[in-house]
């Protein structure tokens, strides 16, 4: 083959076979470059963007339409969700063909439509916008070291547009503007002509055309040489900050940029000097920046995480702002015009011939027969309305001090009113300086000066009312608000209407004010008609004085009824009586209520009375009680606040007042201590009065005696003591009488026995389980008799049941032998005849005894064996020393009990058996032991 290939000359790139290329990427590259030999249609494979086979068999995955032969995404295809609610109704959704197309099919569809690509975008705006949006979309999906959106400067289109390429080929250079040079020159020429025509003088003979022609030549030469260039942005805005290159801090907040720019321009225009900061000082550092964050630490190494928290705070700027404010106030005067020349703005000239004339209109002439129906007078016009004509003008007095005194006094009287003049006249009767008040020296000048001050004050008040107060801005009162809302006004009393009618809209000094401090005619009539203490004239007089001085100027009097002969307690009681009587009179109570309040016979109240402050008292009937006129006055009460137990529990705090009684009311002074007497004295006196008023007939009636059962209140006993203590201690502590005591004792005994039985049963059951013994059930114990029950409790071991049964059988045998002996003694003649029977009986008895002794020996042997086994188990298998001790104690007690039981058995058998039988039994025992 090598020799064959040398004979041929190859031109171009060889076409490769698809079967020879194994790699998918190489195959894709060869297919894209056109170096791959085409196969027939039935052998070709369709692949997607990533080189994956599309139309393959259904059993291997089917149609490749998504994420690695899956549908949609890695998780799979998500169906459309349908949501509809009352607030958000689901609308009719229009379906398009793009909803059912694959990505490859969409690409094929877009290839058929015409759209400007990024390559043919003229200035690259579309490409830049597309790349910026794509970068913002990726920013949300992936984390980034730079937070926020990506700056526009970092995102630039990859390729230049075709328009930029064409402009560069046509001779355009970057940085130059694209416009006609002649257009700008023509515009400048026209503007220069207009400017020169406006400012040329009439007397000048030189025409503006000559000037224009000269400038045209100069500019045309300059324009030919100079090519117009677009001024770069960085020349217009030079860098004056410490930010990074290209960084704009006001990108997302342009309003702050404008504010800063206006502030800087204002500072330049005004021209005031900035205060010397650390940057401009001679002793300041050359860097111009003082490290504000001193707390970072000088010895620590700077790291990425060590950030200066004060780095963004400009200390110099705050220092400048603090010192700028007074400087601005001082420089405001420079902006003012020193002289207005012709009242013309700069850059304009005043017209010599002005056709404008100000047209004025005269006020309308009022006809003579006009009658004014409406008068709009001010609220203070009635007060300041002069009753007499103006006094004549009088020259001031020669004495300068008197003149100053008159002028100052006149202004003060016009401000405060005529009342101050009357008071000054009364107080300064002997002073010669105030003779002008008594028509003396300087009276005419004072009258004239007072009138002038009043007129001046009247004009000022009118002016302020016209300027400030208008019908729409007036302060809304309660009456106007109610009328606007349609509310029904409350009914006023007769007293309020009289006072409002007498006022007349202007302030008047109350003429009846003295009636509250002196005795008026109406109060004298009421005092004569109502005398609650007429039996005691001195007390009645003190009561009247108390009513007069009850509320003097709104304050309670202290020494209203001071009598030297009375004690403190009597005076306090009298004060309380007077208060109660006054309250009863004011509220219009009936005769019985007043009598109950004062605790004295009051036969005076024919009708209710109401005391007022002015002297317009009104007598009302007893049936009608005016609740509005009744006045209640506040009273001070002092008491100790105690928290609720639930509140203390909620806050997890101990109750500080648990088990403590509330304290008695503390006496504030000596009179209160005498007034607040204990209630026991009152109760004792009331009891004595009730006993004296009981008639004698009631004493004869005998009341039936009622037997009261006294409950035995027991002391609280501890739970442990109630369970495990003896009944004798309880009997000593709790003495009882009669049947109740006996019944209680029986109950205690029954409870103690049942409790002991339960405790013993539980203890024995637990002990038997530990030792491996069987414990009899409770039902078996109940079926036995009482002595057996007691013996079972004492001897609770295996084989004990059989021993007790044998004991009972031996007792029955003994009783039968006694009966047979008695029969023998009664019938001595029959002994010979009954020898055979007795011998047979005795032989039967001997056999039974032998069997019993054998069983007894076996039992003893088994008991000894079990005890030895138990002893060995106890020594080897016990877990603690306490259990060993308890088991040894139980063992000893059980051995003692068994030994006693054996003795009782032997004694009983010796009673009912003969000596021979005992001897025989002993012999047999010895033989067995040997």
From Swiss-Prot:
Chain intervals with Basic residues compositional bias: 848-857, 892-908
Q: Where are the SURP motif repeats?
A: 405-447
Its predominant location is: nucleus
Where does the record place the region Disordered?
76-152, 478-508, 687-751, 773-930
Phenotype of the disruptant? Developmental defects, elongation defects of all organs, reduced plant height, triple cotyledons phenotype, reduced vascularization and infertility due to failure to produce pollen.
Q: Where in the cell is it found?
A: Nucleus speckle; Nucleus, Nucleoplasm
* Sequence position, cross-link Glycyl lysine isopeptide (Lys-Gly) (interchain with G-Cter in ubiquitin): 25
| PROSITE patterns (alphabetical) | SURP
Q: Which SUPFAM superfamilies match?
A: Surp module (SWAP domain)
Where does this protein have compositionally biased stretches of type Acidic residues? 701-711
Q: Mind naming one GO cellular-component term on file for this protein?
A: nuclear speck
Keyword annotations of the record = Growth regulation, Isopeptide bond, mRNA processing, Nucleus, RNA-binding, RNA-mediated gene silencing, Ubl conjugation
The Gene Ontology terms for molecular function here are: pre-miRNA binding; primary miRNA binding; RNA binding
Q: Where is the composition biased (Basic and acidic residues)?
A: 489-498, 779-808, 858-877, 913-923
Pinpoint the G-patch domain residues: 159-199
Q: Where is the composition biased (Polar residues)?
A: 499-508
Q: Name one GO biological process term.
A: mRNA processing
Q: In which tissues is it expressed?
A: Expressed in vasculature of cotyledons and leaves, young meristematic tissues, trichomes and pistils.
Functional note: Functions as a component of microRNA (miRNA) and small interfering RNA (siRNA) biogenesis. May assist DCL1 and DCL4 to efficiently process and/or recruit the precursors of miRNAs and siRNAs. In the miRNA biogenesis pathway, associates with the DCL1 complex that processes primary miRNAs (pri-miRNAs) into miRNAs. Binds pri-miRNAs and precursor miRNAs (pre-miRNAs). Is required for the interaction between pri-miRNAs and DRB1. Required for general proper plant growth and, in particular, initiation of vascular development.
Protein name from the UniProt record: G patch domain-containing protein TGH
- Source organism of the structure: Arabidopsis thaliana (Mouse-ear cress)
Which gene underlies this protein?
A: TGH
């Amino acid at each position: 083959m090598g020799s064959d290939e040398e004979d041929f000359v190859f031109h171009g790139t060889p076409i490769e076979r698809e079967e020879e290329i194994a790699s998918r990427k190489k195959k894709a590259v060869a297919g894209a470059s056109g170096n791959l030999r085409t196969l027939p249609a039935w052998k070709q494979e369709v692949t997607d963007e990533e080189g994956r086979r599309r139309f393959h068999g259904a059993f291997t995955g089917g149609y490749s339409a998504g994420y690695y032969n899956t549908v949609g995404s890695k998780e799979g295809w998500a169906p459309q969700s349908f949501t509809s609610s009352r607030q958000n109704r689901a609308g009719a959704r229009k379906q398009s063909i793009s909803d059912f197309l694959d990505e490859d099919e969409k690409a094929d569809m877009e290839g058929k439509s015409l759209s400007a690509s990024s390559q043919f975008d003229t200035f690259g705006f579309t490409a830049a916008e597309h790349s910026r949006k794509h970068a913002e979309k990726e920013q949300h999906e992936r984390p980034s070291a730079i937070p926020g959106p990506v700056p526009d400067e970092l995102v630039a289109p990859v390729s230049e547009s075709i328009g930029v390429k064409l402009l560069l080929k046509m001779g355009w250079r970057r940085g130059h503007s694209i416009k006609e040079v002649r257009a700008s020159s023509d515009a400048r020429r026209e503007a220069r002509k207009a400017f020169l025509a406006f400012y040329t003088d009439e007397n000048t003979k030189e025409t503006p055309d000559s000037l224009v022609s000269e400038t045209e030549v100069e500019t045309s030469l300059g324009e030919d040489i100079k090519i117009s260039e677009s001024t770069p942005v960085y020349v217009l805005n030079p860098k004056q900050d410490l930010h990074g290159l290209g960084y704009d801090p006001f990108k997302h907040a342009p309003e702050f940029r404008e504010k800063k720019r206006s502030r800087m321009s204002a500072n330049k225009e005004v021209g005031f000097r900035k205060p010397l900061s650390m940057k401009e000082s001679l002793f300041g550092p050359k860097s111009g920046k003082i490290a504000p964050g001193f707390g970072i630490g000088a010895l620590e190494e700077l790291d990425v995480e060590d950030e200066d928290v004060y780095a963004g705070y400009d200390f110099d700027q705050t220092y400048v702002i603090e010192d700028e404010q007074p400087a601005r106030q001082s420089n405001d005067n420079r902006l003012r015009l020193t002289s207005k020349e012709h009242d013309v703005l700069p850059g304009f000239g005043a017209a010599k011939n002005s056709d404008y004339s100000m047209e004025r209109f005269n006020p309308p002439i009022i006809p003579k027969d006009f009658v004014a129906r409406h008068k709009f007078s001010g609220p203070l016009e009635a007060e300041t309305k002069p009753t007499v004509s103006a006094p004549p003008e009088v020259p001031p007095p020669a004495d300068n001090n008197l003149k100053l005194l008159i002028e100052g006094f006149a202004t003060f009287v016009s401000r405060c009113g005529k009342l101050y003049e009357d008071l000054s006249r009364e107080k300064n009767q002997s002073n010669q300086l105030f003779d002008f008040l008594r028509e003396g020296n300087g009276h005419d000048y004072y009258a004239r000066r007072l009138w002038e001050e009043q007129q001046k004050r009247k004009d000022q008040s009118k002016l302020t009312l016209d300027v400030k107060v208008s019908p729409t801005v007036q302060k809304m009162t309660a009456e106007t608000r109610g009328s606007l809302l349609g509310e029904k006004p409350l009914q006023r009393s007769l007293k309020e209407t009289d006072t409002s009618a007498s006022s007349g809209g202007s302030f008047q000094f109350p003429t009846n004010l003295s009636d509250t401090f002196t005795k008026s005619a109406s109060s004298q009539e009421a005092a004569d008609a109502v005398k609650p203490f007429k039996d005691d004239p001195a007390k009645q007089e003190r009561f009247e004085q108390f009513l007069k001085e009850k509320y003097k100027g709104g304050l309670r009097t202290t020494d209203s009824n001071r009598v030297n002969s009375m004690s403190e307690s009597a005076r306090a009681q009298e004060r309380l009586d007077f208060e109660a009587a006054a309250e009863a009179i004011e509220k219009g109570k009936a005769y019985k209520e007043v009598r109950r309040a004062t605790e004295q016979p009051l036969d005076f109240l024919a009708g209710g009375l109401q005391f007022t402050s002015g002297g317009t008292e009104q007598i009302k009937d007893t049936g009608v009680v005016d609740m509005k006129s009744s006045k209640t006055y506040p009273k001070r009460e002092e008491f100790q606040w105690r928290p609720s137990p639930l509140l203390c529990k909620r806050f997890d705090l101990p109750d500080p007042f648990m088990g403590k009684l509330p304290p008695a009311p503390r006496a504030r002074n000596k009179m209160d201590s005498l007034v607040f007497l204990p209630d026991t004295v009152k109760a004792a006196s009331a009891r004595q009065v009730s006993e004296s008023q009981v008639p004698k007939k009631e004493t004869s009636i005998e009341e039936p005696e009622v037997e009261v059962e006294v409950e035995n209140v027991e002391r609280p006993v501890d739970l442990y003591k109630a369970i495990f203590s003896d009944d004798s201690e309880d009997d000593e502590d709790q003495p009882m009488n009669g049947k109740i005591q006996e019944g209680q004792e029986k109950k205690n005994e029954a409870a103690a026995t049942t409790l002991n039985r339960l405790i013993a049963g539980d203890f024995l059951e637990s002990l038997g389980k530990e030792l491996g013994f069987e414990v009899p059930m409770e039902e078996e114990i109940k079926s036995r008799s009482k002595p057996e029950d007691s013996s079972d409790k004492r001897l609770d071991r295996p084989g004990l049941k059989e021993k007790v049964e044998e004991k009972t059988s031996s007792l029955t045998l003994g009783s039968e032998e006694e009966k047979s002996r008695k029969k023998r003694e009664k019938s001595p003649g029959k002994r010979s005849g009954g020898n055979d029977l007795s011998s047979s009986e005795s032989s039967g008895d001997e056999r039974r005894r032998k069997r019993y002794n054998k069983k007894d020996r076996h039992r003893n042997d088994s008991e000894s064996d079990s005890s030895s086994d138990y002893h060995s188990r106890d020594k080897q298998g016990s877990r603690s020393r306490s259990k060993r001790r308890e088991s040894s104690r139980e063992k000893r007690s059980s051995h003692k009990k068994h030994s006693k039981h054996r003795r009782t058995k032997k004694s009983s058998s010796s009673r009912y058996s003969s000596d021979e039988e005992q001897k025989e039994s002993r012999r047999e025992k010895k033989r067995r032991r040997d």
